[in-house]
């Protein structure tokens, strides 16, 4: 019998196994250490994340992160997946719908997610659940050792130098845009050791 419940009692190994199986045909792959870092940076909250289980096996899941976004308590979809043989049965929608009362009771006021633009199946599911596109991002990745991040003087008044995330205060007053959840200041503060800061 199918049961939808939170992921609080699920081991990290079992969650990663389900994630790996659900995303086996996805273009981006993560090992378990990368997956755990991703969950940590995105504010993963197992008690507010949910899955559909059958005979103890996780078939479909939504891992939610929580935090503040645009001044409101927010849940962020850090990853929704369904095992291949269970896709097309509406499980992702059922898991999401079952989570709403718990998210609301936890003070969540908005729900945010990001999806690759060419992932038409996911976009279709999210649109059916009432989501709308609010903005689009370009995504670039480079190893820090490939970047030319040298300390230097720009003018007499300005010097670029290495900082630690602890040296930073809230940078939002200087922003001319709001970063994505994954690149928010709160996300950086969750895993500061993963960043090199120049300022």
For the regions a protein language model found, what residue spans apply to each?
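Conserved active-site alpha-helix within GNAT-family acetyltransferase domains
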Residues: 89, 93, 109, 117-135
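A short, polar/charged loop-to-alpha-helix boundary motif
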Residues: 68-74
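Conserved GNAT acetyl-CoA-binding A-motif
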Residues: 103-114
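Amide-forming acyltransferase catalytic core, primarily the GNAT-like/NAT-type
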Residues: 27, 32, 128-199
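A short, internal acetyl-CoA/4′-phosphopantetheine-binding micro-motif in the GNAT/acyltransferase core
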Residues: 79-87
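Active-site rim helix/loop that mediates acceptor-substrate recognition in acyltransferases
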Residues: 12, 19, 27-55, 59-66, ...
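A conserved short alpha-helix in the GNAT/GCN5 acetyltransferase fold that borders
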Residues: 87, 96-104
């Amino acid at each position: 019998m199918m049961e939808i419940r939170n992921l609080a009692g699920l081991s990290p190994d079992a969650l990663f196994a389900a994630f790996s199986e659900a995303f086996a045909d996805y273009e981006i792959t993560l090992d378990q250490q990368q997956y755990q870092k991703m969950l940590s940076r995105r504010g993963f909250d197992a008690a507010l994340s949910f899955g559909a289980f059958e005979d103890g096996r996780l078939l479909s899941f939504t891992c939610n992160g929580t935090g503040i976004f645009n001044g409101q308590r927010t849940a962020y979809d850090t990853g929704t997946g369904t095992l291949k043989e269970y896709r097309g049965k509406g499980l992702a929608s059922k898991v999401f719908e079952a989570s709403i009362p718990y998210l609301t009771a936890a003070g969540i006021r908005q729900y945010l997610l990001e999806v690759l633009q060419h992932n038409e199946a996911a976009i279709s599911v999210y649109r059916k659940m009432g989501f709308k596109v609010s903005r689009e991002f370009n995504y670039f990745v480079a190893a820090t050792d490939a970047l030319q991040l040298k300390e230097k003087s720009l003018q007499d008044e300005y010097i670029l130098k290495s900082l630690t995330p602890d040296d930073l205060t809230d940078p939002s007053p200087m922003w001319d845009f709001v970063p994505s959840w994954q690149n928010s200041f709160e996300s950086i503060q969750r895993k500061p050791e993963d960043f090199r800061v120049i300022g």
